[in-house]
A protein has these predicted regions:
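Active-site cores that bind ATP or allylic diphosphates and position pyrophosphate for catalysis
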Residues: 1-276
């Protein structure tokens, strides 16, 4: 049923799967469950559990408040989506998100806002488009970008050459078949120069913070683990490629802060030890 829905080429995978469920189970609420993006993601998690850890039992927890991507919670429960929080932050700063975040972390948000330690999305969009334009040299400049298929490299190049804003770029790329979220990831991968040489799975564990008494839990992990990226870089070729990609993304993010920061912040970041 799913193959039949995908064959017409007029819908994305999530919509095709929902239509297939409706065709197989008409008159049931199953298809309606797949209206929610997070429920589609849950299906993928359950498939992975069946394949990798069939003894594990997933426990579904209904989402309260706003759904994924909704502006604000439609009911009295004060839970906002991440998209809504970002928009509130951009228009009103830390105080605007105060009703929707834990009271204990609000001082940290206020401190970050005062210091300009947050993304300026206008700057980020222009920086991304500038990087993409700089890569428009030679034939099929985006052919090697990670995740490119079905001629998307040509569509991306045309969109980059014609667009003057990041929103225009995403509008030009997005179709029923190519959802905006996927095109946003594709454009960023292209801007940062990510190709299929990047490991498909994480080759290391970058330790950002922990409780000291819990560090012993890491002794049996199968991957290299460290808080120091340069130490991880020396582990093997896969780690070196991933560290380079991580630093590229970190430096891009630092430049696109409200108050831009210099390169190399990820190399200077010290591990955070939790005390509570």
């Amino acid at each position: 049923a799913l193959k039949a829905q995908l064959a017409d080429g007029a819908r994305n995978f999530a919509a095709a799967r929902q239509a297939a469920v409706e065709a197989l189970c008409p008159g049931t609420p199953l298809a309606a469950l797949l209206d929610k993006p997070n429920n589609n993601l849950a299906v993928e998690y359950c498939k992975a559990i069946l394949e990798l850890a069939p003894a594990m039992t997933p426990v579904p927890l209904p989402r309260q408040g706003a759904d994924h991507g909704q502006e604000l919670a439609p009911d009295a429960v004060r839970f906002a989506s991440a998209s809504a929080l970002r928009k509130l932050w951009q228009t009103g700063g830390a105080d605007a998100v105060a009703p929707y975040v834990p009271e204990a972390v609000l001082p940290f948000y206020r401190e970050a806002f005062a210091a300009g330690q947050y993304t300026d999305f206008d700057a980020a969009g222009r920086c991304e488009l500038a990087l993409l334009r700089s890569r428009c040299v030679g034939q099929t400049p985006f052919a090697a970008v990670r995740g490119v298929s079905e001629g998307l490299e040509h569509r991306l190049e045309r969109a980059v050459r014609a667009s003057t804003t990041h929103e225009e770029l995403l509008d030009a790329l997005t179709t029923v078949r190519y959802p905006r979220a996927r095109m946003r990831r594709l454009a960023m991968d292209a801007a940062l120069g990510y190709d299929d040489a990047l490991p498909a799975l994480p080759p290391y564990l970058h330790l950002l913070g922990a409780r000291r008494e819990a560090l012993s839990l890491l002794k049996d992990v199968n991957l290299p683990v460290s808080h120091a990226l340069m130490r991880l870089k020396d582990e093997n070729d896969a780690c070196a490629r991933m560290v380079s990609a991580q630093l590229t993304a970190s430096d891009f993010s630092a430049l696109c802060r409200k108050i831009p920061e210099p390169m190399g912040s990820a190399l200077r970041q010290k591990i955070i030890f939790l005390t509570k």
